[in-house]
UniProtKB/Swiss-Prot annotation:
Organism of derivation: Gallus gallus (Chicken)
GO cellular component, one term: cytoplasm
A GO MF label: GTP binding
Residues engaged in binding 5-phospho-alpha-D-ribose 1-diphosphate: R154, Y206, P207, I208, L209, S210, T211, G212, N213, T214
Segments of skewed composition (Low complexity): 37-69
Name under which the protein is recorded: Uracil phosphoribosyltransferase homolog
Coiled coil location: none
Length: 277
């Protein structure tokens, strides 16, 4: 079956992707395109929006089909959820300022679940044999233990239920990071993790990556608790090019999974999800 195109890949008779836009995955993987969408007309891609969930209730419209694509410079550390029309519709509802809160939360929860399941599919499994009710021996696999989740409060807490729906007994830690009123720099106010977090793979949850500063501070806290950046997997829904680049430049070993890279992030996410907009 022909692979579903990336959501930022133009279709039709205009021809295929340019050779310089193609990125090759590491050995054992498949080639795929990672593209940044261009901002909609009238928006500025030079000034990323703040990482906090404060902001206008509206989000930018979808990029113009005529917008020129640009290739990702971030390599294999930035991974996009395979695109299809279902995911595109969920993204559209989340960005639509006229969407009701019920539709918004429903769509966000669905998209979160898809991101979590995609990432769990990349974690280690071991082979096992089970016996069916009819006595048949079935060769299967089982999920390896040793993973945990960490949500960056408050918007990251929206992703906790999606993780628990897939891993009922997984342990989840929390980090609260806010901007200092005087310096406007990210400051850690609260952090609580499983005591053996340094031995676990960490699924760090933060739905909107705008500047990347909040995530960078969170990763620094995890490192202070003995966690290596190479075992941290950042789960997000939307990211700006600036946010993803800032995180990967600071921590080249970290992995980011998101559904879309776009210069304008829906920073109203946390307020609308929790009903405080």
């Amino acid at each position: 079956m022909e692979a579903m195109p990336c959501h930022n890949q133009r279709l039709g008779a205009a021809g295929g992707p340019r050779p310089q836009d193609e990125q090759t995955a590491p050995a054992g993987g498949c080639s795929r395109l990672i593209r940044f969408a261009e901002p909609s007309e009238g928006s500025s891609s030079g000034s990323p929006s703040p990482d906090s969930s404060s902001g206008s209730n509206g989000a930018a419209a979808a990029p113009s089909p005529a917008a020129e694509d640009c290739a990702s410079p971030l390599g294999a550390q930035l991974k996009l959820l395979p695109m299809n029309d279902q995911i595109r519709e969920l993204q559209t509802i989340i960005r639509d300022k006229t969407a009701s809160r019920g539709d918004f939360v429903f769509s966000a929860d669905r998209l979160i679940r898809l991101v979590v399941e995609e990432r769990l599919n990349q974690l280690p499994y071991t082979e096992c044999t089970v016996t069916t009710p009819t006595g048949y021996k079935y060769e299967g696999v089982k999920f390896e233990k040793g993973n945990c989740g960490v949500s960056i409060m408050r918007s990251g807490e929206a992703m906790e239920q999606g993780l628990r729906d897939c891993c009922r007994s997984i342990r989840i830690g929390k980090i609260l990071i806010q901007s200092d009123e005087e310096t406007q720099r990210a400051k850690v106010y609260y952090a609580k993790f499983p005591p053996d977090i340094y031995r676990r793979k960490v699924l760090l949850m933060y739905p909107i990556l705008s500047t990347g500063n909040t995530v960078i501070e969170a990763v620094k806290v995890l490192i202070e608790h003995g966690v290596q950046p190479s075992v941290i997997i950042l789960l997000s829904l939307f990211s700006t090019p600036h946010g993803a680049k800032s995180i990967i430049q600071e921590f080249p070993e970290i992995t980011i999974l998101t559904t879309e890279v776009h210069p304008v992030a829906p920073t109203h996410f946390g307020q609308k999800y929790f009903g405080t907009d």
